Amino acid sequence: MEVFPLLLFLSFCWSRTWDLATADSIIHIGAIFDESAKKDDEVFRTAVGDLNQNEEILQTEKITFSVTFVDGNNPFQAVQEACELMNQGILALVSSIGCTSAGSLQSLADAMHIPHLFIQRSTAGTPRSGCGLTRSNRNDDYTLSVRPPVYLNEVILRVVTEYAWQKFIIFYDSEYDIRGIQEFLDKVSQQGMDVALQKVENNINKMITTLFDTMRIEELNRYRDTLRRAILVMNPATAKSFISEVVETNLVAFDCHWIIINEEINDVDVQELVRRSIGRLTIIRQTFPVPQNISQRCFRGNHRISSSLCDPKDPFAQNMEISNLYIYDTVLLLANAFHKKLEDRKWHSMASLSCIRKNSKPWQGGRSMLETIKKGGVNGLTGDLEFGENGGNPNVHFEILGTNYGEELGRGVRKLGCWNPVTGLNGSLTDKKLENNMRGVVLRVVTVLEEPFVMVSENVLGKPKKYQGFSIDVLDALSNYLGFNYEIYVAPDHKYGSPQEDGTWNGLVGELVFKRADIGISALTITPDRENVVDFTTRYMDYSVGVLLRRAEKTVDMFACLAPFDLSLWACIAGTVLLVGLLVYLLNWLNPPRLQMGSMTSTTLYNSMWFVYGSFVQQGGEVPYTTLATRMMMGAWWLFALIVISSYTANLAAFLTITRIESSIQSLQDLSKQTDIPYGTVLDSAVYQHVRMKGLNPFERDSMYSQMWRMINRSNGSENNVLESQAGIQKVKYGNYAFVWDAAVLEYVAINDPDCSFYTVGNTVADRGYGIALQHGSPYRDVFSQRILELQQSGDMDILKHKWWPKNGQCDLYSSVDAKQKGGALDIKSLAGVFCILAAGIVLSCLIAVLETWWSRRKGSRVPSKEDDKEIDLEHLHRRVNSLCTDDDSPHKQFSTSSIDLTPLDIDTLPTRQALEQISDFRNTHITTTTFIPEQIQTLSRTLSAKAASGFAFGSVPEHRTGPFRHRAPNGGFFRSPIKTMSSIPYQPTPTLGLNLGNDPDRGTSI
């Protein structure tokens, strides 16, 4: 490894003390200590002296050493000093410094192959945080951690869980790295605990004074409530000062409970902390095994330890730090490793190593020495010191000390339990119960949310949750009579409790078994299995099993008229209408029908579509079709429409008419016999265990339970069962499911459902009951049972029941059909979609009418003015036409005036070329007239053109004009002809072919 050349320019301004080895010594070790750890240096020298005097370990060889002091948080200085030690030649490096410098020494030791024994040291007795040294999976990791890993997260989490704290505050001093308990904070947050953090400054008095100056009375009271549960992560000196300040300023009361955790707390610190505190105090510290025989306390095998280190009465031993003990055991471990190497004659001489040279080689004997140290082990002041595969010391033990609640200062302290990574907590942290007088007793109550037994009534941020319900009313009645107070919390797993495979219990019962709660109350049934592990009061309410089902109800859909057909079928029908209409149009276009004279019909695409749609809705059509192909097409279409309309009508009646058949499930027996509706219960609940026990019992006569168990146990219970009762209720409400559960709970749900969509069936025989669970051997069982009997005899219990289960509820519990739907008439909601379709058609037709009116007015505005109108003497025209159309001997025959019948005519609406029979043409004269000629002479209209052509000589046509016509009234006046309908007829002047057809005043205006 190449070290930066910058190290060459570092000044040697740090004080160092060297104890040089004698020229013939082959055992030389180096030590680097924090400059504030003077006691580490003293213990190190004492350990070397004790071992040099022990001729059984090192017979002829003596240990020499070199010690240097550095700033624990200066990695450059630590590397510089380590290089100086390696340059002298050392077999191993011992360091007692901070984590920052330890990482640099780890890299240097790995490069030089020097065994490095690291003792983590905290600043001024503050609790340690994990160093997080990088461990390589290869064999080139030469750093061994003498002190065990930091287990503060695991220990404090176990203790807080044992005490069942839900809200507390953590105080830590300014020297502590709060990241050390990050894992603990994450886990308690996942469990829903309310945790606050506050840093304690060095000037504690000033900090407390600032709190009183800045907080209002309400805020200060809330802060006092927070201090009832607190954890102190700080050095012993700061903890003593902090406790004294908060006690003197009355920030804490006698009901407070504080936990102090620190590996460095000694016996003197424990006595002082207990003396200054009030309320309950729990102390967590690291402990080491001590021989029971006093005379053997200073002996570890064949080695004798100096009395100043092992005698509890010695002042030096009383004030020793944890790192001092591990320093001594480290030297003892190295001495035994050296002895092992000498015995095996596998000794590797020391080598002078240079960190600065680029081509410097590591020590060849480093790997062999490291393996000897790792495989060895000693029993010293800290107990067994050995290393695992990861290079760490796994042996650690914590001691949990505590006091009981009390008002007087200076209470006694006792050992509550111990903790280690292998077995966990050993012991009970529950304090002793007070006397039978329950005045002032605070009980911890665990519950499970279950309507209407226990429900959350108020959940305000920053305040404890408030609960209500039937069980809470019973608990309040007991509390008011007996005088105790209680703190309530919800079971972490929200379960009532059932035995596990390892013999433990979970849920509410598990909280009582592990003594984390004093009382358990909810919809908790009394069962034989539960009575084996906890105590129950007398039942305060009867219990029976019920079934929750959903009523048969009508589905309201405003577009129910569309329900008989699927959306895809509607789309196919619409496409079929368009397709058939198009085919009808094409067939008539390819083979047009021959219509009778005078018919005004037209087979356009629009008319074809309209005809197809009209026939589909059975309203007929206006366009007659005479071709064989078209008629075959329409015949098939009419048959299709008949079947579709008939199917729609029948299916619509089925959809709009509700079949109100009473449910066949009226009991548990009915439920077990059917398989259409799946059913289940809460997994591992009392109902689940009851059905399982009955269903698997070969001597059970009733087959109902075996049938129910087969349904409930599908897929090992995961298919039809739920984890919570609320999930089962929701499953019934929104699916095809029946929920088997406590009848009292189901009745409350059915009564208070806003939609009245539930009904219940079940067994009315109460073979069990609900009770209050207590710890096994609790002194409160009898007094609770007695008070419950008094409430039942006085009728107060019935009053509480009627509060939550009223007799006259808004819903019927036992009817499987909604009473509101028993009528036979359809309501407006069922056919609202039809009205919507009609309204849409009306609105659309009105819009089209407005557009047509606008278009007609716009088109009419283009008609020429009255000044440009030309008048025509239609009577003169009639005479001339009559003269042309009659025989030669009757040249003066005229039409009867009464035969002239002029009707309004819109040129735009004239038929197409296919109806030419309806129009009389004067082809050569460019005069076109409509069929206002009487019917009896219509046949003459076709010869009119030829006669005119032969009887007149055409001259040049000077111009082509258009204009409306007028004719004379019988009284000789003029009036506008009915043909004057905002349209024009083209005409040209008739040329003179030998006849004088000029303008004649008597004949009126000519065309």
From Swiss-Prot:
Glycans are attached at residues 293, 426, 713, 716. Residues 921-991 are annotated as: Interaction with AP4M1. Residues 24-566, 657-830 are extracellular. Expressed selectively in cerebellar Purkinje cells where it is localized in dendritic spines. It holds the Pfam family Lig_chan. It is a multi-pass membrane protein. The chain crosses the membrane at residues 567-587, 636-656, 831-851. It comes from the Eukaryota. One of its GO terms (molecular function) is metal ion binding. The record marks 76 as: Essential for dimerization. Keywords: Calcium, Cell membrane, Disease variant, Disulfide bond, Glycoprotein, Ion channel, Ion transport, Ligand-gated ion channel, Membrane, Metal-binding, Phosphoprotein, Postsynaptic cell membrane, Receptor, Signal, Synapse, Transmembrane, Transmembrane helix, Transport. Tetramer; dimer of dimers. Interacts with EML2, MAGI2 (via PDZ domains) and AP4M1. Interacts with BECN1, GOPC, GRID2IP, SHANK1 and SHANK2. Interacts with CBLN2, but not with CBLN4. Interacts with CBLN1 (via C1q domain); the interaction is CBLN1-NRX1 complex formation-dependent; CBLN1-binding is calcium-independent; CBLN1 hexamers anchor GRID2 N-terminal domain dimers to monomeric NRXN1 isoform beta; promotes synaptogenesis and mediates the D-Serine-dependent long term depression signals and AMPA receptor endocytosis. The PDZ-binding motif mediates interaction with GOPC. The lineage of its organism: Eukaryota, Metazoa, Chordata, Craniata, Vertebrata. GO terms for biological process: cerebellar granule cell differentiation; excitatory postsynaptic potential; excitatory synapse assembly; heterophilic cell-cell adhesion via plasma membrane cell adhesion molecules; positive regulation of long-term synaptic depression; positive regulation of synapse assembly; prepulse inhibition; protein localization. The modification Phosphoserine is found at residues 883, 890, 1006. Residues 24-345 are annotated as: Interaction with CBLN1 homotrimer. It is linked to Defects in Grid2 are the cause of the Lurcher phenotype. Heterozygous animals display a characteristic swaying of the hind quarters and jerky up and down movements following cerebellar Purkinje cell degeneration during postnatal development. Homozygous animals die shortly after birth because of a massive loss of midbrain and hindbrain neurons during late embryogenesis. The keyword Chaperone does not apply. One of its GO terms (cellular component) is parallel fiber to Purkinje cell synapse. It catalyses: Ca(2+)(in) = Ca(2+)(out); Na(+)(in) = Na(+)(out). It is found in: Postsynaptic cell membrane. This is Glutamate receptor ionotropic, delta-2. Belongs to the glutamate-gated ion channel (TC 1.A.10.1) family. GRID2 subfamily. A motif (PDZ-binding) lies at residues 1005-1007. The modification Phosphothreonine is found at residue 886.
